[in-house]
């Protein structure tokens, strides 16, 4: 006769819901005792998991990023030369200092201009600046600043200038294949966890290089290997698309920023703004672009009007009017923000109301459908 064997059931199957909750609380308490408070938590109960942001200085870019640079995350800003990378980060430093925060600038390129930084609103007297000799020294300084939890933002300018010690101590022309990529990979593994715990935002500026032998696709790539691409929560691709001129005099550039990666908001949005030589990002220019798109300010020909009154002929004159009328500027900004909170999306340099976009799409769809029906009837009659 066959012998009946009783299968032993796992203890988890016989545990009641109340006992499961008790066991979970016990193990959570044990983990916190072993590894410290905050080592494990429920996502809904963790206030520090709610991502706060730092303004970029450009309202259009803030909207494209979902509020600004996320705190406690790694950000990479890359682009060609003279596209506005350093200017963008100096504005972020100024915003942090304006809120009473502490900022640090790791100048690996040894190219920081204090006079220009001060003109953008940076408090250079209280700005922490380091000009390291090697890439290892620079990244170790970043790690110690982050672990102190006393610094709100650290900017590294740039990844391409983080030269490994072995390359500096070697002879000119010696091959050091992959040394910078290995350095960045090790550094990102080490500092990313500390960045999240301290709430410090670390912005890496990066340069572009061309891949050799690429026939199809984009030949551009960033320096320092692939580690930074993976660890960065936000990656911004900034380009100069236009040179601003008054007659023959050049006074600024028009910059276009594409959000190539975003882990805290929808990616692939695009923002445009003006960067004025010696003054930085034109905040009033950003406001005027958004006010026009949201309908707060209207334009007929070259004239801009607000509440039915003409306020300026041409974009530059209208921006000048906003500078001379701060109360009206504040009112327009409030109205623009109210429009944006009602529901809108970033389209290139400004915003487009979702409802209007939906109506436009529906109208086009209906028109296309009627054309198809008319075509079918015509063919049937023939």
Curated annotation (Swiss-Prot):
Report the InterPro entries cross-referenced here.
Answer: AAA+_ATPase, DNA_recomb/repair_RecA, DNA_recomb/repair_RecA_CS, P-loop_NTPase, RecA-like_C, RecA-like_N, RecA_C_sf
First-listed, main subcellular location of the protein, grouped into a coarse class: cytoplasm
Is Cytoplasm found in the keyword set?
yes
Where does it reside?
Answer: Cytoplasm
Q: Which GO terms describe its molecular function?
A: ATP binding; ATP hydrolysis activity; ATP-dependent DNA damage sensor activity; damaged DNA binding; single-stranded DNA binding
Task: Enumerate the residue ranges of region (Disordered).
Answer: 362-382
Task: Write out the GO biological process terms.
Answer: DNA recombination; DNA repair; SOS response
Which positions bind ATP? 79-86
Task: Extract the CDD domains matched here.
Answer: RecA
Question: Which Gene Ontology cellular component terms are annotated?
Answer: cytosol
> Which Pfam families would you find in this protein's record?
RecA, RecA_C
Entry keywords, A to Z: ATP-binding, Cytoplasm, DNA damage, DNA recombination, DNA repair, DNA-binding, Nucleotide-binding, SOS response
Q: What does this protein do?
A: Can catalyze the hydrolysis of ATP in the presence of single-stranded DNA, the ATP-dependent uptake of single-stranded DNA by duplex DNA, and the ATP-dependent hybridization of homologous single-stranded DNAs. It interacts with LexA causing its activation and leading to its autocatalytic cleavage.
Q: Which family does it belong to?
A: Belongs to the RecA family.
Matches recorded under PANTHER family: MITOCHONDRIAL DNA REPAIR PROTEIN RECA HOMOLOG-RELATED, RECA
Give the protein's recorded name: Protein RecA
Q: Which organism is it from?
A: Synechococcus sp. (strain WH7803)
Lineage, broadest ranks: Bacteria, Bacillati, Cyanobacteriota, Cyanophyceae, Synechococcales
């Amino acid at each position: 006769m066959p012998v009946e064997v009783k299968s032993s059931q796992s203890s988890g199957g016989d545990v009641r819901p109340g006992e499961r909750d008790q066991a979970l609380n016990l193990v959570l308490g044990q983990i916190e005792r072993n590894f410290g408070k905050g080592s494990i938590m429920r996502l809904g109960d963790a206030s520090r998991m709610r991502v706060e942001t730092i303004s970029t200085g450009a309202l259009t870019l803030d909207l494209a990023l979902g509020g600004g640079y996320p705190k406690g995350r790694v950000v990479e800003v890359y682009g060609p030369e003279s596209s506005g990378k350093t200017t963008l980060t100096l504005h972020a430093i100024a915003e942090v200092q304006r809120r009473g925060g502490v900022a640090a600038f790791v100048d690996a390129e040894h190219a920081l201009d204090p006079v220009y930084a001060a003109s953008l609103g940076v408090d250079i007297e209280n700005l922490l600046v380091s000009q390291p000799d090697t890439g290892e020294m620079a990244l170790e300084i970043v790690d110690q600043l982050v672990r102190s939890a006393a610094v709100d933002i650290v900017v590294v300018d740039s990844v391409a200038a983080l030269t490994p010690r072995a390359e500096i101590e070697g002879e000119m022309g010696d091959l050091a294949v992959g040394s910078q990529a290995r350095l960045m990979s090790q550094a990102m593994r080490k500092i990313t966890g500390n960045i999240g715990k301290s709430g410090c935002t670390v912005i890496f500026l990066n340069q572009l290089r061309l891949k050799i032998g690429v026939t199809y696709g984009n030949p551009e790539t960033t320096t320092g290997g692939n580690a930074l691409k993976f660890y960065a929560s936000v990656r911004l691709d900034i380009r100069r698309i236009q040179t601003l001129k008054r007659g023959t005099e050049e006074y600024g550039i028009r910059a276009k920023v594409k959000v190539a990666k975003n882990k805290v908001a929808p990616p692939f949005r695009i923002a445009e703004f003006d960067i004025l030589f010696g003054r930085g990002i034109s905040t009033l220019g950003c406001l005027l672009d958004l006010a026009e798109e949201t309908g707060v300010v209207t334009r007929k020909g070259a004239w801009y009007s607000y509440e039915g009154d003409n306020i300026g002929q041409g974009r530059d004159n209208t921006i000048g009017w906003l500078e001379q009328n701060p109360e009206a500027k504040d009112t327009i900004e409030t109205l623009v923000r109210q429009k944006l909170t009602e529901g809108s999306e970033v389209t290139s340099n400004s915003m487009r109301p979702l409802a209007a976009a939906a109506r436009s799409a529906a109208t086009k769809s209906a028109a296309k459908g009627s054309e198809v029906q008319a075509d079918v009837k015509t063919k049937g009659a023939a």
